[in-house]
Amino acid sequence: NIKKRNDKINELNNYLSLMCSGNFDLDIMDNSEGEMSILKNNLYKIMTLLKTQNEQLNTDKLYLANSLADISHQLKTPLTSMMVMSDLLKDEKDEGKRNEFLSIIETQLDKMKWLITNLLKISKLDAGATEFKHEKFNIAPILEKSLKQFYVTCDVREIEIVNEINDFEFVGDENWTGEAIENIIKNCIEHTNNNGKLRFFSQKTNVYNSLFIQDNGCGITKEDLPHIFERFYHGKNSSSESVGIGLALAKTVLEKEKGDIIVNSELGKGSIFELRFYKTIV
């Protein structure tokens, strides 16, 4: 009995050594009875947990590497443009040309600022470093506030804004909901031609209230549709101004509020984004 017990202890010790070296593919389940079997099965549970955590860690490392590559690429493009414009400015005497180059540099700086700001926001959401308020708000004032910053752009491009919403209450965070709405509006404007139309309307059900944001732009292909909320994703019809972070941020915000964003689109006819606010947590 003592020999058998020592053999089992040595066996468990070997399993522990293999686990410490990173081997989590051991078949150590034991269906027999006894204290050693209980210990062995508990060891198996720990091994399974460590294996899952290790796989998640590798996934996170890969995601981080890909994200850093994407961020680097997104920053490299405007930086390259600014460097070119800066070199041209050194030798350019024409005041009109100089102002044109400075305008391009300013545009690229705004693009970089927007990217960095939104990356910081989405990082805070990922890290759980942001506390979401759960208060009652009306959607109409939030939409109006979000729309204000796009009035000039829509006016210049002659994009018609049609606001047909019936106001409703929802429980959430006013500022973060505004962020989500702004990013969807920005996306719709980027993919809508001059003389286009943006339409806002709402729908109420017993379970949720919805805000719809509709454009009559280029639409989204069936292949791209399942991926548009992925970070840094660029579809076939992506705008040159798009960095692929706005819709991901909007989706994250709605999910944090226990809501959802649903999109329907038809190529060449436009897209409809539905922001769904549940009346009770589901």
Please provide the spans of the model-predicted regions.
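Acidic ATP/Mg2+-coordinating residue in the GHKL
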Residues: D215
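Short conserved segment of the HATPase_c
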Residues: I220-Y233
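A conserved beta-strand-to-alpha-helix junction within the catalytic ATP-binding
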Residues: K133-K148
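Short helix-loop "hinge" at the ATP-lid/N-box region of the Bergerat-fold HATPase_c
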Residues: N187-I189
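Conserved micro-motifs of the catalytic ATP-binding
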Residues: A127-F132, I165, E169-G172
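Short alpha-helical segment of the dimerization/phosphotransfer core of two-component systems
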Residues: T107-M112
